[in-house]
Amino acid sequence: MSGLGIMVLTLLLFMFMATSHQDAGEKQATQRDAINVRRRRSITRRGDEECNEYCDDRNKECCGRTNGHPRCANVCFG
């Protein structure tokens, strides 16, 4: 095989390795984001039982707490 052919094959191999590494990094970042979302939700759910009961009595949704008091609304934004 000529020197030019070897260089082309080597370049293609490096390009393949670089794109595979990028894809793995993106997948890992996506998994990390999913874990962070799960952690946030579990923390929020634990403290919201009292808020949910308080707002359910008023036929509204619990939107979190403001200054330690449950904040209820028909629809929660953010």
Swiss-Prot record:
Residues 1-24 form the signal peptide. It is found in: Secreted. Disulfide bonds join 51-63, 55-72, 62-76. Keywords: Amidation, Cleavage on pair of basic residues, Disulfide bond, Knottin, Neurotoxin, Secreted, Signal, Toxin. This is Conotoxin TsMSGL-12. One of its GO terms (molecular function) is toxin activity. The modification Phenylalanine amide is found at residue 77. GO terms for cellular component: extracellular region. The presence of a 'disulfide through disulfide knot' structurally defines this protein as a knottin. The cysteine framework is VI/VII (C-C-CC-C-C). It comes from the Eukaryota. Expressed by the venom duct. Pfam families: Conotoxin. Belongs to the conotoxin O3 superfamily. It comes from Conus tessulatus (Tessellate cone). Residues 25-44 form a propeptide.
